């Protein structure tokens, strides 16, 4: 009997996302319920954004939750390497096989040509897609260009008509017209694969039998199915999981909800409660109980109990469930966990240099730096009153800085400062006009340790959470303001 093998394949391009943890949990439970194996693979082909620091954060976040893997970059295994950036020769080999078999082709189109193609198609009211012009090149012309070292990509051929049937373990057969599919790039001009080729090759070579992934990938499933057909490989069983949603039913995003697992760890949530809550996202125990452990979820896991309605990720409900877990701890364990959370040595070492020079006794540390150990702050609206800025301008400054910080890929003091500086310059203000607002929102005080250092230490999710909290206190942002300010944001460098 074939061993069930599932996997999670996150990209190390930022803080570990709760959506990644959610999909990892369901893959883990499915594998373990069937006595199988769970694999961790790192999709780091985006060399500009991928970092080893983010990769380590993924490892740490999953392990904090209690999710372990049988094979992966840090534990090894018989199907490595487990980082896609280390598998370049493998992908090149299989891409060449597709070209030789007539299932893929070399494309030498420049970015300018592709942009013109898209513009012309849009002008005609057509859906932009590659028009296949490289297929008209003769074999001799293709070879001449390859020999000359012209930049190129490899694209897959797709049918122009007919229906692809996607067998989904949750929805049954899903029919998707082939005319919605583009001639997908498989190998980029930097020699690295796109998601589609790497995903299929890796899942096959690693013996993955079942793939549970987010439903946002369902519309592009025909491309993956066609690649399996081209290679002559057996396709894993597919399951497209419902996406996590904000309370307003929109897709879970950092603009409306803290999305980093690290944020919830920093806020003092228990990993058991976090995992329990993620397990309730679209799934339920047979007896409908709300509180259950990972072991209990594995024991009773059944895909048929997954609801297709978008599960709502609500921090208030998570907090309630976390309270249930906390209050049931033995007092000794509660105290031990509290001490471990509050006096994390690595975190304390980040904070200590910024408070040591400003206190005369240890008892003064808490009033000065207590905000480092809090989640939501009790903010005072008076702290946001400005002699120079109107109430509307105050909200505008905070909102624009929040938006700029949301696009920040590397969370460093210099880059945080750059975001704030860009906003104040665009509004023809001075840095000193904005910094009191940052002190008020981030520390809950009129002054404290360097707020820029504090923002770097607190991290992106907690910083953005507090800025959103400040905006809510000040009345929020109207739809009209949101539209006007987003236009202004687009003009800020």
UniProtKB/Swiss-Prot annotation:
Keywords: Aminoacyl-tRNA synthetase, ATP-binding, Cytoplasm, Ligase, Nucleotide-binding, Protein biosynthesis. The keyword DNA damage does not apply. Its EC number is 6.1.1.17. GO terms for cellular component: cytosol. It catalyses: tRNA(Glu) + L-glutamate + ATP = L-glutamyl-tRNA(Glu) + AMP + diphosphate. CDD domains: GluRS_core. It is found in: Cytoplasm. A motif ('KMSKS' region) lies at residues 251-255. A motif ('HIGH' region) lies at residues 10-20. One of its GO terms (biological process) is glutamyl-tRNA aminoacylation. Pfam families: Anticodon_2, tRNA-synt_1c. It comes from the Bacteria. One of its GO terms (molecular function) is ATP binding. It is an enzyme of class 6 (ligase). ATP binds at residue 254. Belongs to the class-I aminoacyl-tRNA synthetase family. Glutamate--tRNA ligase type 1 subfamily. NCBIfam families: gltX_bact. HAMAP family: Glu_tRNA_synth_type1. Monomer. PANTHER family: GLUTAMATE--TRNA LIGASE (PTHR43311), GLUTAMATE--TRNA LIGASE, MITOCHONDRIAL-RELATED (PTHR43311:SF2). Catalyzes the attachment of glutamate to tRNA(Glu) in a two-step reaction: glutamate is first activated by ATP to form Glu-AMP and then transferred to the acceptor end of tRNA(Glu). This is Glutamate--tRNA ligase.
